[in-house]
């Protein structure tokens, strides 16, 4: 039976749904070591022309937590706090470094006591000049991150960093600048980047922005030849056993455009492609035009896990990523979350807890008379794991998940709605899917709950079941002792044919009843047709479901 959905019903369902926001929360947990987080990081952060015309305070508000800043001496400074200015190759300058610290970063950190910010300094100043500036900013000392304040075995968690108020990390590209700067008896610590992290070469993407995909180079050579990207630990001189951080550079170092950034540089597929070529999960993702494209969703997926949708079957790395959806309970409208409509054909799961249920629908209102897939996660899926569901049109029973597909005319490339929730306990979600063809083929007619006792007429019911259409069923889930009876008579009398189906043991994986015109028994069910054939003639149902 071809289902028609009135436009008003579709619009109402979408508007009423609890749509997850496009900009997800930065992190769901603050109890992982710092090296297990990823952060949006802006290249030449002070140049708003390359950052969607947004100054650094706006970037902070939008969730940016890494900032690349170039600092130069100001030979015309008349006061110590003006000794250093922020410039791009001395061609364009953007004011005093102290002003940005005092008026932008310090107020943000004071107002947000759980947040951590990292500043990457491209340094053209001396220690004395930096000391002059720091000495005018005593508040920095109370915010500065100092590794000496934490045990040697691992990076502190975000919560531990917040508890000690060590929430502003300074990294410099010059070893002679690194060290402690004493201000009123307290240190401001600047770390030498090559001791603590690795980077890919920032120049591979090319000098100029371009709308030609082949002009982009997604390879991932290391920036420093003596530090392979897979270098595991920080430098021994740090006296720490901490994991090295990774800054993944993904920007054109000459010009950038919002169009190129959105289509290529900050596109989910190409961010993932760079990561795959690097072979390391980034802690910092350095980009231009951070608000164009999907870098925020990409980073959210790395931090919090998510549902990754792919354009092709198999969810393989060669396929384009449609989008990543954060795992938040509710209804996800794909378009509102950056997903192209009717594109996805497979998915992978990361960082998802046991007991999560994900349901994908063809119908935007979630009508179960059309194609839908129910996925129950059976074990915790790690944040760095990609658990693949290769197609939306298969029943699958795996150690990590169970997928039940109720077919109408196909779901691949047609997903319009996703619901995220919890797997019901026991047999609370027991159900039967009825089909218009034998062997659970042709159109899906309706899905009926099998967890209670109820009767219904086929042409007048709340499930959408049709009169004189049903020929087979798929028992999705059922408790032993449940049964149902179908009759050819519209009032449920037995004189126009009847078939009883008894559940002999718990059914937790889909079981097909290929026809209601036969009599048979196996370990799972007893099917009894009483004399007259009823396939395609069913008009009434008695449901006796147990839970």
What are these regions (language model features)?
Residues 1-9:
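Bacterial N-terminal signal peptides that target proteins for export
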Residues 2, 13-16:
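Classical secretory targeting signals
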């Amino acid at each position: 039976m071809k289902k028609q959905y009135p436009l008003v019903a579709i619009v109402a369902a979408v508007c009423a749904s609890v749509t997850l926001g496009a900009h997800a929360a930065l992190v769901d947990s603050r109890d992982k070591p710092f090296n297990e987080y990823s952060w949006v990081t802006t290249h030449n952060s002070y140049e708003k022309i390359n950052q969607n015309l947004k100054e650094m305070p706006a970037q902070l508000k939008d969730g940016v937590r890494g900032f690349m800043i170039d600092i130069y001496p100001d030979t015309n400074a008349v006061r110590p706090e003006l000794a250093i200015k922020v410039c791009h190759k001395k061609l364009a300058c953007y004011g005093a470094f102290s002003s940005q610290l005092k008026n932008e970063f310090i107020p943000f950190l004071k107002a947000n006591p759980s947040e951590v910010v990292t500043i990457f300094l491209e340094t053209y100043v001396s220690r004395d000049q930096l000391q002059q500036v720091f000495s005018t900013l005593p508040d920095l000392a109370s915010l500065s991150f100092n590794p000496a304040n934490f045990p040697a075995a691992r990076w502190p968690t975000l919560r531990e960093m917040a508890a000690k108020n060590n929430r502003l990390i300074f990294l410099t590209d010059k070893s002679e600048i690194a060290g402690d700067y004493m201000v009123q008896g307290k240190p401001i610590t600047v770390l030498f980047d090559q001791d603590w992290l690795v980077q890919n070469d920032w120049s591979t993407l090319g000098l100029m922005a371009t709308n030609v995909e082949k002009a982009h180079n997604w390879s991932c050579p290391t920036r420093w030849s003596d530090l392979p990207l897979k270098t595991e630990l920080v430098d021994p001189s740090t006296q720490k056993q901490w994991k090295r951080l990774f800054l993944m550079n993904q920007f054109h170092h000459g010009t950038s455009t919002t169009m190129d950034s959105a289509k290529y540089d900050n596109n989910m597929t190409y961010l993932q492609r760079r990561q795959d070529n690097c072979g390391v999960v980034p802690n910092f993702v350095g980009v231009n035009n951070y608000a164009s494209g999907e870098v925020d969703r990409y980073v959210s997926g790395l931090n919090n896990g998510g549902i990754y949708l792919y354009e092709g079957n198999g969810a393989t790395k060669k396929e384009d990523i449609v989008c990543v959806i954060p795992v938040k309970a509710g209804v996800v409208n794909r378009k509102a979350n950056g997903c192209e409509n009717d594109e996805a054909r497979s998915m992978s799961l990361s960082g998802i807890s046991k007991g999560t249920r994900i349901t994908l629908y063809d119908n935007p209102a979630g009508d179960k008379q059309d194609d839908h897939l129910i996925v129950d996660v059976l074990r915790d899926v790690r944040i760095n794991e990609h658990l693949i569901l290769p197609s939306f049109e298969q029943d699958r029973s795996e150690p990590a998940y169970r997928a039940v597909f109720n077919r109408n005319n196909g779901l691949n490339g047609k997903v319009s709605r996703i619901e995220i929730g919890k797997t019901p306990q026991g047999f609370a979600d027991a159900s039967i899917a009825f089909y218009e063809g034998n062997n659970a083929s042709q159109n899906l007619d309706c899905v009926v709950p099998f967890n209670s006792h109820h009767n219904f007429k086929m042409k007048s019911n709340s499930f959408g079941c049709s009169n004189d259409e049903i020929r087979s069923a798929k028992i999705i889930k059922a408790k032993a002792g449940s049964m149902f009876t179908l009759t050819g008579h519209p009032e449920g009398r037995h004189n126009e044919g009847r078939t009883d189906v008894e559940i002999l043991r718990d059914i937790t994986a889909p079981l097909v009843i290929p026809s209601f015109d036969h009599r048979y028994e196996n370990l799972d069910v007893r099917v009894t047709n009483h004399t007259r054939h009823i396939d395609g003639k069913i008009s009434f149902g008695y449901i006796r479901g147990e839970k």
